[in-house]
């Protein structure tokens, strides 16, 4: 998605937005972690385009200290660990470094679609923010996945699938 471009949040969001804008109809966005941040950002910027929103392990104000600590750890990890992200190590470090200032608190009121906020019971880095986010969005519901951590789609796929299907069945 960022081929030939700088690994920054701004570039990633621009590429994501361009993909979403290709759809003529309203869209339903579902994102996990960084994907949730991108989906939330898009729903804020394009409230009339997003029909529904699912945010898994979401943040609405980036935890600056946590991101900086994470980046410090990334510097000591081998390059091979980053293949799962689809980025090079330097790109992940760069991307995280550009996200520390993200803060959507003043814009959450622009999200007008139904939203499902999901977080794993053991996802200590995101659970508090996810619960808060659900309370700030006007038409939202929070669901905690039992026994799941940050990678809820891997750790609780059946429960997540059930929760998603129930939500999608109620989206008009």
What feature does the model see in each segment?
Residues 1-28, 162:
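Active-site loop/oxyanion-hole signature of alpha/beta-hydrolase fold enzymes
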Residues 148-157, 161:
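Catalytic histidine-centered segment of alpha/beta-hydrolase-like enzymes
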Residues 130, 134-151:
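Catalytic histidine neighborhood in serine/cysteine hydrolases
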Residues 124-129:
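Conserved alpha/beta-hydrolase "acid-adjacent" motif
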Residues 110-111, 117-119:
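Short beta-strand/loop motif that positions the catalytic acidic residue
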Residues 9, 40-45, 49-80:
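Flexible "cap/lid" loop of the alpha/beta hydrolase fold
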Residues 80-104, 122:
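Hydrophobic, aromatic-rich cap/lid helix
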Residues 31-39:
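Gly/Ala-rich beta-loop-alpha elbow adjacent to hydrolase catalytic centers
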């Amino acid at each position: 998605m960022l081929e030939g471009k700088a690994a920054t949040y701004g570039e990633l969001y621009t590429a994501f937005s361009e993909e979403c804008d290709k759809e003529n109809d309203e869209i339903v966005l579902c994102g996990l972690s960084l994907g949730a941040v991108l989906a939330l950002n898009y729903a804020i910027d394009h409230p009339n385009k997003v029909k529904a929103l699912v945010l898994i392990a979401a943040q609405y104000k980036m935890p600056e200290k946590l991101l900086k600590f994470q980046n410090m750890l990334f510097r000591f990890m081998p390059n091979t660990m980053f293949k799962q992200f689809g980025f090079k190590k330097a790109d992940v470090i760069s991307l995280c470094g550009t996200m520390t200032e993200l803060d959507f608190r003043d814009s959450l009121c622009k999200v007008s679609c139904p939203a499902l906020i999901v977080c794993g019971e053991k996802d200590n880095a995101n659970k508090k923010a996810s619960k808060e986010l659900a309370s700030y969005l006007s038409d939202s519901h929070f669901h905690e996945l039992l026994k799941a951590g940050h990678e809820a789609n891997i750790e609780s796929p059946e429960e997540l699938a059930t929760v998603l299907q129930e939500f999608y069945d109620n989206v008009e």
